[in-house]
Swiss-Prot record:
Record text on subunit structure and interactions: Homotetramer.
Name of this chain's protein: Pyrrolidone-carboxylate peptidase 1
EC assignment: 3.4.19.3
Highest taxon in the source lineage: Bacteria
Active site residues according to the UniProt entry: E78, C141, H165
Gene from which this protein is expressed: pcp1
Organism of this sequence: Caldanaerobacter subterraneus subsp. tengcongensis (strain DSM 15242 / JCM 11007 / NBRC 100824 / MB4) (Thermoanaerobacter tengcongensis)
Function: Removes 5-oxoproline from various penultimate amino acid residues except L-proline.
GO biological process: proteolysis
GO molecular function, one term: pyroglutamyl-peptidase activity
Length: 203
C-alpha cells in the first residue's frame, strides 16, 4: 500500500511551514504502508499540477494533504472542499484569484473520502486536540483538496483523499501574542495517527 502525503512551502511572510516540517519528520513506513512525501508550492494552480503529476507517477492508494491554518487550536480534519478560490493574499507566484471557480464544470463541492471522524477520535486518544472542520477556507489548501478530489472523480480512480489543517509551530508565534500553536512532535504524532487510521480503513 502507498500513501502520498503532500505539504506546502512557507507563505505569507513566514520562514517555515509546519506542514512541511511535519512531512519531513514522518516515518517512511506506517502500518506497512509506504509513505511517499511531496512538497508542493503554496500556489493555486501549480500545487494541483505537482500533486497530479505525482499521483500519475506512483499510483497511491490514498492522498493526504497537510496545510498550515494559523490561528487554529487543534488538528482540523477537513470534511469538504468547495469549488471557489477567494484569496485574501497573493500566493507564492503572485496569483490572487477572487471569487473564481476552481473548475467551472465541476460540482460545487467534494467531501473527503478518508474516515474523518475516526481520524479525529484516534488523535484524541493520543491526548491531542482534534476536530472535524467544515471549511478548508478559499485559499490554496482548499484549492488543492478540491483539485485532487476532482482529478480522482473525473478519472474514476480508486484513491482515497483528504486534507488536514495544523496549527502554527511555537517559533511562529513569538511575535504573535495569544496565538495558538502546537509542538512539532505532537503534530507529527497526530498525522502519523491519521495515516494509521487511513491504512487500517483500506486494509
Amino acid at each position: 500500500m502507498k500513501i502520498l502525503v503532500t505539504a506546502f512551502d512557507p507563505f505569507g511572510g513566514e520562514s517555515v511551514n509546519p506542514s512541511y516540517e511535519v512531512l519531513k519528520n514522518l516515518k517512511d513506513n506506517i502500518e506497512g504502508a509506504e509513505i511517499i512525501k511531496l512538497q508542493v508550492p503554496t500556489a493555486f494552480y501549480v500545487s494541483v499540477e505537482k500533486a497530479i503529476e505525482k499521483i500519475k507517477e506512483v499510483n497511491p492508494d490514498a492522498v493526504l494533504s497537510i496545510g498550515q491554518a494559523g490561528g487554529r487550536y487543534d488538528i482540523s480534519v477537513e470534511r469538504v472542499a468547495i469549488n471557489i478560490d477567494d484569496a485574501r493574499i497573493p500566493d507564492n507566484m503572485g496569483q490572487q484569484p477572487i471569487d473564481i471557480p476552481i473548475d467551472p464544470e465541476g460540482p460545487p463541492a467534494y467531501f473527503a473520502t478518508i474516515p474523518i471522524k475516526e481520524i479525529v477520535e484516534a488523535i484524541k486518544k493520543e491526548n491531542l486536540p482534534a476536530s472535524v472542520s467544515n471549511s478548508a477556507g478559499t485559499y490554496v489548501c482548499n484549492h488543492l483538496m478540491y483539485g485532487i478530489l476532482n482529478y480522482i472523480h473525473k478519472n474514476k480512480l480508486n484513491i482515497k483523499a483528504g486534507f488536514i489543517h495544523i496549527p502554527y509551530l511555537p517559533e511562529q508565534v513569538l511575535e504573535k501574542p495569544n496565538t495558538p500553536y502546537m509542538s512539532l512532535s505532537d503534530m507529527v504524532k497526530a498525522i502519523e495517527t491519521a495515516i494509521k487510521v487511513i491504512v487500517k480503513a483500506m486494509a
